Amino acid sequence: MSASTTATLRHDWTLAEVRALFVQPFNDLLFQAQTVHRAHFDANRVQVSTLLSIKTGACPEDCKYCPQSGHYNTGLEKEKLLEVQKVLEEAARAKAIGSTRFCMGAAWKHPSAKDMPYVLEMVKGVKAMGMETCMTLGRLDQEQTEALATAGLDYYNHNLDTSPEFYGSIITTRTYSERLQTLAYVRDAGMKICSGGILGMGESLDDRAGLLIQLANLPEHPESVPINMLVKVAGTPLENAEDVDPFDFIRMLAVARILMPKSHVRLSAGREAMNEQMQALAFFAGANSIFYGDKLLTTANPQADKDMLLFSRLGIKPEAGEGHADEVHQAAIEQALVEQQSSSMFYDAASA
């Protein structure tokens, strides 16, 4: 067994080391990743989250992959910030069918002073339901970060998207250093970090390695690392980007698992395009978190009942959330997920 499979937490990965992980034989890489995974997680448990878009469209950022950018005509109807009560109703529905974490996303460059009180009420309300809370609101200043932490926010999502070298080819309205600063504020405020990136934007292997190096070499590893496959949306500059080789995507998940042994690696956007065999490989490679429901912000996500049927076929069960380890409660969640047949409970932020 190589030194890398011992799952020692490191923050000094080099490009040469990570490149070597990527290019080794596929079976060797997956064996190594699965070995690391089993050292820290139950290999047959997957964390389940629900994501709600609380403010959709008209974002001033120019991210070339994003249908919510106001710079591109994608046909997405913009919406104002959802009312707090509506958000809490959706959180209650998500909890009722088994989600343990509720993530709220807003298409902002950064939250405004007038919106922050409503955002904080959302956090407090969802937290009061006994769910883990997560938000993605764009860039934060230190005061906003501390306010979110005080309100009870558990996780803050702020993706790095790609390597520092390729970043300028995708986004010009926010710097890489600004993203890193937001992550530093989040960590200093005592919240957990959710940060990852996207494959399929024209990046090189070294860019993929570079993204993971940035994340793994942070002072503390992100607790959650979402790995997204580009969802090509008409009207965005990347609508005709070349498809990602499925094996290359699985390699990305496996290397993320090896570099960040204790982090949840999330199989995130793009799952709609993955067949069941590819998703099963993703779980074997160390992915142990998914978004559950019909929409991932504004792009399609596999239907909830299909997810649970696949879980059943693979012998996978949903992971209990923090503070939700009671066996009776967990059994009820698992049964509700298996029996769930309708996805009508989930709010489609793009169709309101």
UniProtKB/Swiss-Prot annotation:
Binding locations of [4Fe-4S] cluster: C59, C63, C66
Pfam family, one: Radical_SAM
UniProt domain Radical SAM core: residue ranges: 44-262
GO MF annotation, one: iron ion binding
Pathway this chain belongs to: Cofactor biosynthesis; biotin biosynthesis; biotin from 7,8-diaminononanoate: step 2/2
Keywords: 2Fe-2S, 4Fe-4S, Biotin biosynthesis, Iron, Iron-sulfur, Metal-binding, S-adenosyl-L-methionine, Transferase
Record carries keyword Iron: yes
Cofactors, names only: [4Fe-4S] cluster; [2Fe-2S] cluster
Co-factor remark: Binds 1 [4Fe-4S] cluster. The cluster is coordinated with 3 cysteines and an exchangeable S-adenosyl-L-methionine.
One record GO biological process: biotin biosynthetic process
Reaction equations catalysed: (4R,5S)-dethiobiotin + (sulfur carrier)-SH + 2 reduced [2Fe-2S]-[ferredoxin] + 2 S-adenosyl-L-methionine = (sulfur carrier)-H + biotin + 2 5'-deoxyadenosine + 2 L-methionine + 2 oxidized [2Fe-2S]-[ferredoxin]
Positions that bind [2Fe-2S] cluster: C103, C134, C194, R266
Enzyme Commission number(s) of this protein: 2.8.1.6
Function: Catalyzes the conversion of dethiobiotin (DTB) to biotin by the insertion of a sulfur atom into dethiobiotin via a radical-based mechanism.
Family designation: Belongs to the radical SAM superfamily. Biotin synthase family.
Xref: HAMAP family: BioB
Matching PANTHER family: BIOTIN SYNTHASE, BIOTIN SYNTHASE, MITOCHONDRIAL
Subunit structure: Homodimer.
Protein name listed in UniProt: Biotin synthase
Source organism of the structure: Pseudomonas syringae pv. syringae (strain B728a)
